[in-house]
Amino acid sequence: MSKQSALLSAPSSSLLLEVVEGALVIQHWGAPLAGDLSAIQTAIRPSIANSSWDAPQFPGIMRESSRGFLGRPTLSGHRNGKAWSTKFEVSNFHHDGNSVAITFTDFHAQLEVLITFDLDRHGVLTQKAVLKNLGDSQYALNEFIHWLPLPKEATQTLDFAGRWSNERNPQRKEIATGTWVRESREGRSGHNFSIADIALTPQTTFQTGKAWATSIAWSGNSHYLVEKLFDGSQSIGAGELLLPGEVILSAGESYSAPALISVFSGQGLDGIASSYHQHLRSRELHPKRPRPLTLNMWEAVYFDHNEEKIKALIDVASEIGIERVVLDDGWFHSRRDDRAGLGDWVIDPAVWPHGLAPIIKYINDKGIEFGLWFEGEMVNPDSDLYRAHPEWILHEADRVPPLWRHELVLDLGHEGAFNHVLEQTSAVLAAHNIAYIKWDHNRVLVDAGHLGSAGVHRQTQAIYQLFAELKKRHPGLEIESCASGGARVDLGVIDLVDRFWTSDNNDALERQTIQRWTAQVIAPELLGTHIGPTHGHQTGRTLELSMRATTALFGHAGIEWNITEATPDERKHLATWAKYYKENRAHLHTGKMVRVDYPDSHAYLHGVTAHDLSRAIFAYVQLTPTLTVHPSPLKFPDLDPSGTYSVKAVFPAGKPRFMLISPPEWMSGVTMSGSALAAIGVTAPILAPANAVLIEITKL
C-alpha cells in the first residue's frame, strides 16, 4: 500500500482506498478486512492483455478518459466547449479514524473536487462531493455521479418500480455488459423512484448472501447506474440528474452533489435494511418520543368538513385511544373540491365560520394532538394567488404546463412565491396549537422553468429550505412527507421530516408488499401505516379487521376510516389493538426487521426481533391461497439458539378467518428453544387468503 491509503472499517464491512499514480483507487468495498494489507496493491495489480494499454491504467474514482477509462466518467462539464476532459491529481489526503477527505485538483481545467467518505459503526458509507470552479470563466456542469466498484461475484441487481398506489415493486435482473440506468425525471423522487439500487449474488436472499446497496440522498431528478465494461470491471453509482444549464458555476462557486448512502451486507437483504435502520436511528434528528397513534380524517370526510361530523369522529377516536388527529384537504379558502384553492392558505370562513381554534380545542381537551394538511408547492389556476401572480409558476417561455389534478407547480425558487408559502403557512401554525403537518405534493414537474432556465434543482433546494425554516420558527413541529402517497420517500428529505406517507393505498393486502420493500431502506417507525376502511377506497377489496390491523401495526400506526361507522365489536377491537400498539411500539420501532425466506410464495412471514434477542413479534400473512393443504412450517431466525422461548398467537384486533376445523395447538402457547424455532419451527395455521395472525415470542 502507498503512504496515502486509508482503511475504514465497521464490524460488517470495510472500505480500502489508496492513491495510485495520482488517482484515488477504491481497492475494496465489502467484507471486513484485517491484518497486513501492504501487499494488496501487488496482489491485485492487473496484467497486460493483448490489444490493450502498454501499462496498467488506474483511472480511480474520477473515472477519467485521460487515465484510460472507457466508461461513464464521474464528472462531465465544460467551459464553453473547453475544459471538457480532466486529469485530476490528489492534492490533499486526510484520514481520521473512519473518515477520509480527499482533494483533487486539475489546474489545467481549473477545477477542484473534495470527496469525503465516512463509514459509521453500522456499516453505512456516506459519500459526499463538492466541485469548485477555480477559474475566472463559467463552468457548465452536466453531471456528477458517485461511483463504487462491484466485485465480479455481484451478477444481479435489485431495484424498485411502481406507480401511484403501487409503489416500490422489486425488479431483480442479471447485470449485462453495458451501462444500465434508472432515471427519475418527475421533479420529485416519484412513485417509480428506486429507493435503492442493490447489487447481489444469485444466492442472496433476505437472510443470507452478499449485497451492495446504494441510495441517493436527493428528492429531485436523479439517476442510478450500473456499468459493466468489456474488460470485466463493474461499478454502481448514482447522482442528481441535472437538466441543461441548471448548474453553471461562476468563478469561486461550488456545487455540492447529493450524498450517496451505501451499505455492504454479508447477511442478505435484511443485513442491508438493518444497517440503514440503525444508521437512521442514530441521527440526532431521529424522532425520540413514541410515535403517536394517528387518525387521518381524509377517507372519513373528504371535502365534507362538517364540524359536528368531525366532533363525532373525535369522540370515537378518543374512546379508541387515538393520540393525534389530522384534518386533511379542504379547510382553506374556496377548497370545496380539488379544482380550486391551492395557494390560498387561509382558513375558509364558509366552512369554519369560527376558525379552526374551537375544533382544535375540542381535540386537545381530549388529550389528542392536532395536525393539518398543506400542499404548499402547488397552485390551482382557480385561486386568488394564481390570479394575482400567474408568473409564479414553474414554466418555460410563455407556455403553461399541462394540468395534473387541476394543479400547477409554484416556483419556490422565486422569492415572492417562497415567502408567500412560508408566511401563510407559518401564520396558520403560529395562530393554533398544531403539532404536525402533512405536506403533500400531488403532481409531477414538467416544462419546469425558472426565469428562462431549468428549475428542478432550485425547486428541490427550496423545499428543503422551506421545511427547515418552518421547523426553526415552530420548535417541535413534525412534518410528514406525502406526495400522492409515497412519491417523496428518500434519504434527501429525511432529515427534515418525521414521517413518510408510504402510499395512498390503504388496502392491507397491497400494503404488505409496499411496506415490505419501503422498509428496505426506511426504518418502519418513519412509515405511516394505517388501518383503512373495511371496503377499500382504492381497490374495492373487503378485508378482515384483523388483517388491516396486523398490517398497520408494523410501522407508525394509525387509522384512515370513518370509525363512526364501525360496529361496537370493531370499536372494541380497535381499542384493544391501540393498547397493543402502545405497549409494543418501543419494541417494533427499535428492533431488527426480519423477513423470513419463507418457501411458500403465497405467504409472508416477517417480524421484529429485539437486539438482545429477548423477544420478537412476527406476522404470518396468507396473501393468496396455498397450493397445498398444509403450508410450510413457520421458522423463526434471529433468536438465541440456546435460549428458551414461549410462543403464542395473539389477536389484539380479533381473530383472522381460518380455513380449518381446529387450529394448531401451539397457538395457545408452547415452550421451545431458539434453535428448535429456527430449525423446526411451528405448524402454520391454515388461513383464508388476505388474512394474518400475530405471533409473540418471549425469552424465558
Model-flagged regions — what are they?
Residues 4-16, 24-227, 644-662:
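Polysaccharide-binding surfaces and accessory modules of carbohydrate-active proteins
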Residues 12, 129, 252, 325, ...:
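Conserved, mostly hydrophobic/aromatic
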Residues 12, 196, 598-641:
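Carbohydrate-binding surface patches
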Residues 55-85, 206-222, 263-285, 322-329, ...:
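Glycine-rich, aromatic-flanked loop segments that form ligand/cofactor-binding clefts
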Residues 247-265, 690-697:
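Short Pro-Gly-centered flexible turn/kink motifs
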Residues 288-423, 436:
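Aromatic-lined carbohydrate-binding/catalytic grooves of carbohydrate-active enzymes
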Residues 353-355, 389, 393-546, 556-558, ...:
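Active-site neighborhood of glycoside hydrolase catalytic domains
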Residues 624-700:
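C-terminal beta-sandwich/jelly-roll accessory domains of carbohydrate-active enzymes
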